Amino acid sequence: MKHRLFLLATLGLLLVLAACVAPAPPSVATSAGGESSAAAAQPAVVEAPAGPTGSLMVALSLEPNSINPPNGADRMAGNVINQIFDSLMSIDNSSGEIVPALATAWEVAADGSLYTFTLRQGVTFHDGSAFNAQDVVATFAAGKDPANAYASAYDPVVAVVDDYTVTIAPVTPDVTFLRRMAETRIISDEQFAAEGNAGIESHPIGTGPFQFVQWNKGDRIVLQANPNYWDAGKPHLAEVIFRPISESSTRLAAIQTGEVHIVNRLNSDEAASLTGAGQVQVITYPADRVYYIAFNNLTTGVGLPTENKLVRQAMNHAVDRQAIVDGLFNGHARLSSGFVTPSNLGFDESLAPFAYDPDKARALLSEAGFPDGFSIGMACPVGAYTNFEEVCQAIANYLAEVGITMEGGEVQFLESGVYWDKEAAKELPPLFGDSWSASVGEALPRLNGALDGMNASYSSWSDPEIDAMLNQIAQTFDNEARAALYKELQAYMLDNPPFIYLYEPISFEAINSAVQGYVPNSVEQYELKDVSLNQ
């Protein structure tokens, strides 16, 4: 019982501390459609200056693994990439609608098999070269490099019609394709031809609102305003500096002292300590991000007890996720029942999360043929997510209570960059922790990313039934019919869990009151071309 007693004592202490120091959190603003919206919490808008001015300091919760678009493995990498590179279209932060960017118009074949894009003319890259159709071709050619984290996302076939028209054909019809394209950042054909992906990695050249200056590893990434940006009057900032600060408490101190202007992934106690601070505003919203412990049946988990669905059900029942959420997040998270969240199309609110029931867990293990439990390896990243190391340790302790112990006696904790590389190479242990967001408004990319077998870099599981359901969802363009398919999938994945489902967090960000025009979103994605500083 020592693991259980230790964990409960630890969580009890955290709850006592939370009750002592944490006032009620800032309210969450939610739009009529159910999407989280923190826009109402912004400072009053002031008119931006005529030309770029001011230096915005942004804290990152971890060092990006890469700033080459197809290789950026995490949201922090993406937040730097998004300022340097543009995509063919964008998602409007306020409305959630698809809007033109490097493409001014597009047509979609009735069966979703072909997309034709009309490209914006007069756009230049940061080195002065002209943007045209060849750059779209180069983007997909560069992305296909198997060394990239998201190589499988670049499978579609691109063809040039003329200098400012391209067609893109997905391998199979995909209802989320246009929204995925809003995440596909366009690189320079000239740079790729001359320098390859290595050149893009060391000094990326895009068409975005900010251009790359330098990256001092462990210290800062410096960007400066693109003076020839195609979106007239933007950006408003002269400079953006990203500061990787892995320790949450250090990020808190940095926003308190004015060293940085924006921080995210604060915990609830840290956010509460900022409430009422004169120059700092706290914004909170439900994140469209699911945390989980993956089961691996592709490589390291082959032939292990976790291939038995009763074992996987048992492990879900073994973990008291509510105690973890209460103890480590002051209750500011929703327990997950699957990979479709309340803001996603087709969410089934009738499906309850696995109940904490260690006796049922033991009974299921016995029924599966493992009455004495077993030993298994588990890994988690360090510094990637709020309190995640503590979450992983708590899970290991709960599993030990039903006889499932860690190989080597402990969870393997790895630096996040090393961790993502091992995850992409399918070299992590049979259990590993991670999270997925879904920036397209529904869960399909998240589901594909984690469950597409050996085809996707960060997937861990393959199930022919799930594969068939996902293929059907991707090819169903009627929203009502697709929502029904999502519900079928959720029920199947609850009975045949490919993960230990954990939680969907409430996100806490803090911004300096001088920051104007900043609109957070549910996937923690920064778009800074509209931001200015009131100095």
Regions found by a protein language model. Give the residues of each.
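Ligand-site clamp/hinge motif
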Residues: 142, 228-273
